[in-house]
């Protein structure tokens, strides 16, 4: 059986992958085999880190809220604050509360004082 020449199809596939990895360093952007491996590895990393980013930001927001609450009253904790928020049916998520804690602490103090009552 005669050997078939792939022509432009294989070249087009390789250039598509090469464009994806053009910003990588060294052989990771030049050699076809390592390019395909690095592309798969990069996509795996981005998929994993999208979930990790959600976790990290949630931890950051909780830390910021907790720090501001502890400044206001030492006996009041973050978990009690969130519990009281839900009891009062205030629809403020952690992201918004963290932004309030950074930009306008007095507003967060007012919210926590209203909840405590």
Swiss-Prot record:
Subcellular localization: Plastid, Chloroplast
Annotated keywords: Chloroplast, Plastid, Ribonucleoprotein, Ribosomal protein, RNA-binding, rRNA-binding
GO cellular component: chloroplast; ribonucleoprotein complex; ribosome
Entries under PROSITE patterns matching the protein: RIBOSOMAL_L20
GO molecular function (one): structural constituent of ribosome
Main location as per UniProt: plastid
GO biological process entries: ribosomal large subunit assembly; translation
A Pfam family hit: Ribosomal_L20
Family: Belongs to the bacterial ribosomal protein bL20 family.
Job description of the protein: Binds directly to 23S ribosomal RNA and is necessary for the in vitro assembly process of the 50S ribosomal subunit. It is not involved in the protein synthesizing functions of that subunit.
Record's protein name: Large ribosomal subunit protein bL20c
Organism expressing this protein natively: Vitis vinifera
Gene name in the database record: rpl20
